């Protein structure tokens, strides 16, 4: 990225799953005290998809919300990049499903990116580079982060979650990306694996925490060697669970008041993988504390491992998030038995014909494994 062209986030929207489950339902089923989850992990509840929701329906809804909120002409979009690690199709990208929202615009570049929870940030960096290049002939690019996290490993269950974030990227941004602040760390790690033979991931929990901390240590120390720790006003993290973010902040002397407001979605919707960092950003924006010229530092991490740190600066008004708490509260609360039923169907890639209050796109049929989606 160059200094000459200002590129960044013009708008941001999101989609939550239709259900949620309280950690009080989870604790006795995994043999934990509730405080081990609420205090030890910082989790209160997490989002759960319905029988007619998947990563594509969440992405469709998030992008549709974005297009409507910012009155985007589909012809003005020239690139769509999707970050995900939970797509059910190894060949056809989620991006191609999203094209049903763009009428006759068949010249949209881009596809999907996968590297655990980092794919969304890689998609963003791709779109930023395209936006400031001579290849760009359009007004906007769109970045989508969409994921569903579910586990059969009991210690990981309380950190489940689901959701999608869509970001409108352009040359007249509300949040300008500051290119010289980007630092990346990447190594070959064996902390997390999704094998094609099974739905659920293999997790080395303690090792993954250490890899996360090692990645952060490397990029943050590089960052503060060139910029003061006071350079940024707020910080948002990829949040596997809120207490992990708090521990990292304490270890690196980052004031918690710079971070606390960003943890709302993580506490109440769980780990959304590629979308996690950007739900943290949404939570921070929703607090209405970010003022003109404030700098927000972002830390992205994906097991395996890739980690990056970079900063954005608010340079104009816009990008408001006014209803996050209300949308979190409006999800239907389910019990553990319902959760188990959904879990079983998800790992079998089954779709149950059940009436659900889905505010957005949902699966209407599956034929020869191809799924069709419509908006209610």
List where the protein language model places each region:
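Conserved beta-ketoacyl condensing-enzyme motif
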Residues: 9, 55-115, 226-252
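A conserved active-site cap/scaffold subdomain adjacent to cofactor or substrate pockets
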Residues: 206-224, 231-245, 270
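Short, well-ordered amphipathic alpha-helical segments that serve as non-catalytic structural scaffolds
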Residues: 33, 55-70, 94, 211-227, ...
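Conserved catalytic cysteine-centered active-site region
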Residues: 36-40, 44-54, 86-140, 251-276
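Condensing-enzyme catalytic core mediating Claisen C-C bond formation in acyl metabolism
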Residues: 1-52, 154-210, 214, 310-376
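Acidic, glycine-rich active-site loops and adjacent beta-strand->loop/helix elements
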Residues: 13-15, 83-88, 115-119, 144-150, ...
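Catalytic phosphate/nucleotide-handling subdomain of diverse soluble enzymes
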Residues: 282-329
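Flexible, glycine-rich active-site loops centered on histidine and acidic residues
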Residues: 132-166
